[in-house]
Curated annotation (Swiss-Prot):
Part of the binding-protein-dependent transport system for branched-chain amino acids. Probably responsible for the translocation of the substrates across the membrane. InterPro entries: ABC_transp_permease, LivM-like. The gene is livM. This is Probable branched-chain amino acid transport permease protein LivM. The chain crosses the membrane at residues 3-23, 42-62, 91-111, 124-144, 163-183, 222-242, 269-289, 297-317.
Amino acid sequence: MSIDLISMILLWFGLYYIVSLSLNMEFGYAGIPNFGKALSVLVGAIAVGGILDRLLMLYFGIGGDFITGTTYATSAINNLIASNPIVGIGILILAIILASILGFVVGAIFILPSAKLKEDYLGITLLAISEAVLLICTYNLNIIGGYYGISTPDILAFVSGEYRGWVFAWIVLFIAFLVYLFFERLLNTPFGRVLRAMRENENTVKAFGRDIMKLRIKTMAIGSAIGAIAGVLYSLYTVNIIANAFTRVDWTFFPFLMVLLGGKGNNKGVALGVLCYVIVKVLLDIYKYNIKYALGIPFEPVWLSYMLFGVLMLLILYYKPSGLIPEKPIITPPMKKKIMEISGK
């Protein structure tokens, strides 16, 4: 396995793990079927392309056409980053902050029209809203350049090309690890236990005086804020944003596959699911034509991954609905103390 292949696997693992962790909180813990997950990733791209790029244009005094202006602005900032790496780090931090705030607000607003719906209708409504926003971003050139796309800053302009992939992969992995620690801490609190209770039986949660709508809004706001971080990292890695890159297949359905494969409600299981998916995905992308000629597949190999992962999704739902690492029961500190007392006796 080549060095570049390993760095690509690590990079995609980090990106998808961030998205899948946020989806695991929404779906695995809270039971919200967020079929519009791609929207939160798109929001991260909007924060970079629609807000950060405009700020750079203002800073360098560049006017005129938005798409052309971003090209000049990113070229100017890249030259600055190449001589001063701190600027690149600052842009990354600023982009993450902007995306998190925007994602939090959009996530809360996103769920409002459908927060009181049952699971089936809720999932369909979220999908419809997400697709509508994607279409608007695709055909409105003033948001993120539409189908033409726009340039984004190269935060690693000071790193030579042969090492850029590795450095960016480690940055993404580090941020993914921080996100993992955040969710482990958050979901092992009373808030996380309430989300599990809401997933199992909303009426029970209502009986204890908790507002289901407020819980859903909080969950979606946090999940969207984290999902937007993945959008930022992806946009900065590719140094280009195009709306068509944020489809429901890549950023909604495949993350659902990873969560279900690893085990919903279990962040460690999700990591295993993401790793399995990413390894297969990267290998298929690289060797798809070799597989086509070796097996004599009578269709274009570009569709092979969609077919394979679609069949895998059905097999998981039918034979292994709990995933590779099933969710563990909740054991609170008082319960642990009681168990230790009993075992001691």
